Structures are given as C-alpha cells and as structure tokens.
Amino acid sequence: RHLYLNSLDGKSSAQVTKGNFEITNIEAVDETNKRIFYTMAYPTPMDRNLFVTDFNGKKATQLTKGNGTHRVQLNDDYTKFYDFYSDLNTPQIVTVHDIVVDKKKNISTNLVKTVNESAKLKEKLTEYGYGKAEFMRVPNSKGDTLNGWMLKPANFDATKKYPVLFCNYGGPGSQQVANRFGAVSA
C-alpha cells in the first residue's frame, strides 16, 4: 500500500510513495507545509516507523529509528510527537520529540524527554524469569518465507526436549508476528 495524491475532481492522481514496503497508517496531513506523516512497515514487515514526505514524494524522511514498533501522536501544529515504542522483548518506552525543519526544509528530530521507561515492569519480568522471544523465518512448500516467533524458557537448555505449543496465523488483516511488546502471548 502506498500514498497517492488525487485532485478533488478525480481527474488527476499522482503516486507519492514507491518501494518494496507497506504504509500501514496515515498519521497526519499538514496541508500548510504540504507534508504527510505516515507509519510504514520498515525495516521489516514486523516493524513500524514514522516517516514524513512532501506532497510530491521527493523528500521522504524517517523520523523514528530502529527495529520495533513506534506508535506516535503528533501535536496540532506538527512540531512535536509522542513516541510509544516497544519491541518483542522491550516494554513500552514513551518519549517526546521535537520536529525540526532547517532552512533547506530538511526535517530531523530532537529527543526532548523520556516520559516512561517501564522500569518496574522490566524488573518484574526479570524477577519472574520471563524468557526472551526471538523471530524466526520458515519457508513453506510454495517457497514463500513465513515470519514467526519463538518463546523459550529463561533457563533454556538446547540439550533437553521441551513441549511445543504452536499457534497458527488467524487470517487476513490480523498480523500475529509483530515486533512489539505483548505480541508474544504464550
């Protein structure tokens, strides 16, 4: 899925984004500055990062970095955003960022503050011996590669046998393998 800019009369349409990725949400449209803020499945289909582009798609900029899931909330004048970040093994971290536009209209971000790091939850997970989840990729009989995750016990010993609980994918529109905390529900 990509972004398109259509005229109100429906007579013209221009593709704004291109590439081998999927846009998962339009976060905001800044009509004054002709920018679109959107979340994209990048750098892998399991991750979500915030990007901004101009209406012609020539200046796309990644505003959040790294693997994991960034859920964002922009302020009304598109100068700040809250980033609700987590990954498969990291509980939610909430940060506030300024959106900075220089004289050449290049866009970057500055971390303003960390609001919450879920420190108590991290301590409890360690105390309870919560195992680390890991991603895996499995080829199917048609040659497609399927994404999955595996949760091993905290004291996993590769020389021992363990019971396996296998959960299958529930169908279209229901992504079960996501790089966010809470995606592992076993």
Question: What does each model-identified segment do?
Answer:
Residues 69-186:
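Serine-hydrolase catalytic core recognition
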Residues 36, 61, 136:
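A broad, low-specificity signal marking well-ordered, structured residues that form hydrophobic/aromatic
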Residues 35-39, 81-84:
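Residue position within the beta-strands of beta-propeller blades
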Residues 6-30, 40-43, 53-70, 99-132:
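Multi-bladed beta-propeller domains
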Residues 30-33, 76-77:
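Residue-level detector of Asp-centered blade-edge/turn motifs that repeat once per structural unit
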